[in-house]
């Protein structure tokens, strides 16, 4: 049986990493084989691309930014995601193509139709079984990020940019594969909701 593909999305500081840790623990308890991965940086090549994308000392023009994310995703899908799904392993990814649509499409204003065609090429048309959006006002998320130390290149964008990204995610979340949770809740409460989504997939 093919594995399930689950993606976790949200603005900066939304608590994706914490929820992914909860998900991994849950799947382990249920004896469901799984891997945890991320974009960008889910492969050896992707880690190099991630360094280029998020390092503030490397100025990246918007068009190059899109193509770097797509290169990372193409490698990620071909090298890691599809092979694991084919073996019956569940794949949990911290971000996937919805982040490109939210950040580069809604955030930077690139044509969504064009982006979707690029994404379809890079992903071989692979769509998640479930996408969880942890929704959070960007000012709350950025204040959380500030507590971690230095901002990366995307985190340094304006509040207005991050507000557009959030609105983009909410527009994308109209798709039936999405489930939206309130990122202002306690982490345990958020996971209680996510656990219900996982049980629905595994039923």
From Swiss-Prot:
It comes from the Bacteria. GO terms for cellular component: cytosol. ATP binds at residues 10-17. Keywords: ATP-binding, Kinase, Nucleotide biosynthesis, Nucleotide-binding, Transferase. GO terms for biological process: dTDP biosynthetic process; dTTP biosynthetic process; dUDP biosynthetic process. One of its GO terms (molecular function) is ATP binding. It is an enzyme of class 2 (transferase). Phosphorylation of dTMP to form dTDP in both de novo and salvage pathways of dTTP synthesis. PANTHER family: THYMIDYLATE KINASE (PTHR10344), UMP-CMP KINASE 2, MITOCHONDRIAL (PTHR10344:SF4). This is Thymidylate kinase. It comes from Carboxydothermus hydrogenoformans (strain ATCC BAA-161 / DSM 6008 / Z-2901). The lineage of its organism: Bacteria, Bacillati, Bacillota, Clostridia, Thermoanaerobacterales. The gene is tmk.
């Amino acid at each position: 049986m093919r594995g399930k593909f689950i993606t976790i999305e949200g603005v900066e500081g939304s608590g994706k990493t914490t929820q992914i840790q909860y998900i991994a623990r849950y799947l382990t308890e249920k004896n469901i084989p799984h891997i945890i991965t991320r974009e960008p940086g889910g492969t050896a090549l992707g880690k190099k691309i991630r360094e280029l994308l998020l390092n503030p000392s490397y100025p990246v023009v918007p068009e190059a930014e899109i193509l770097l994310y797509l290169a990372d995703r193409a490698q990620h899908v071909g090298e890691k995601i599809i092979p694991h799904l084919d073996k019956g392993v569940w794949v949990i990814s911290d971000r996937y193509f919805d982040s490109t649509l939210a950040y580069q499409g809604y955030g930077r204003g690139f044509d969504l139709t064009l982006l979707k065609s690029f994404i379809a090429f890079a992903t071989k048309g692979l769509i998640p079984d479930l996408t969880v959006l942890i929704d959070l006002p960007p000012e709350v998320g950025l204040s959380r990020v500030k507590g971690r130390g230095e901002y990366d290149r995307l985190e340094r964008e304006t509040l207005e940019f991050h507000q557009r990204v959030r609105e983009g995610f909410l527009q994308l979340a109209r798709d039936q594969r999405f489930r939206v949770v309130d990122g202002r809740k306690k982490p345990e409460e958020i996971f209680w909701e996510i656990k219900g989504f996982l049980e629905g997939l595994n039923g």
